[in-house]
């Protein structure tokens, strides 16, 4: 679980305009949060024009920490769920408010991902 702790920290700032953070009890929960974080941050990059490469960085971390946790079908469904929730929030808040509210979390996630990727695998 010590290896999971830094990765868990990455999941916390990912979604500013969101539902409450889900409890993470094990590696599968952490990997689900990571996978959905990748999808949501990719949505932010495409929708808001954020260009910090956070989704790519989180995908690298997920590849290290979460190999073979989900089938391709499960991974696709979880990603689609995160994108759907992002779309609903975007429509509810409007582009300006949605992007503004998620900017700091996106930047924080990028810094945490950079720190995590500097560590040895």
Identify what each model region corresponds to.
Residues 2-7:
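Sec-dependent signal peptide recognition
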Residues 13-18:
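N-terminal signal peptide c-region/cleavage motif recognized by signal peptidases
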Residues 21, 38-39, 88, 96:
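Helix-centric, low-specificity signal for extended rod-like, repetitive segments
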Residues 22-73:
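Short N-proximal segments of mature Sec-exported proteins
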Residues 57-121:
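Compact alpha-helical subdomains of small soluble proteins
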């Amino acid at each position: 679980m010590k290896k999971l702790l830094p990765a868990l920290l990455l999941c916390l700032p990912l979604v500013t305009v969101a539902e409450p953070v889900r409890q993470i009890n094990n590696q599968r929960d952490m990997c689900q949060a990571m996978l959905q974080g990748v999808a949501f941050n990719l949505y932010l990059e495409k929708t808001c024009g954020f260009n910090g490469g956070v989704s790519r960085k989180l995908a690298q971390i997920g590849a290290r920490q979460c190999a073979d946790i989900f089938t391709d079908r499960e991974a696709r469904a979880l990603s689609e769920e995160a994108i759907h929730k992002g779309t609903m929030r975007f429509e509810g808040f409007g582009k300006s408010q949605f992007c503004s509210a998620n900017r700091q979390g996106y930047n924080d996630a990028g810094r945490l991902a950079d720190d995590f990727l500097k560590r040895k695998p």
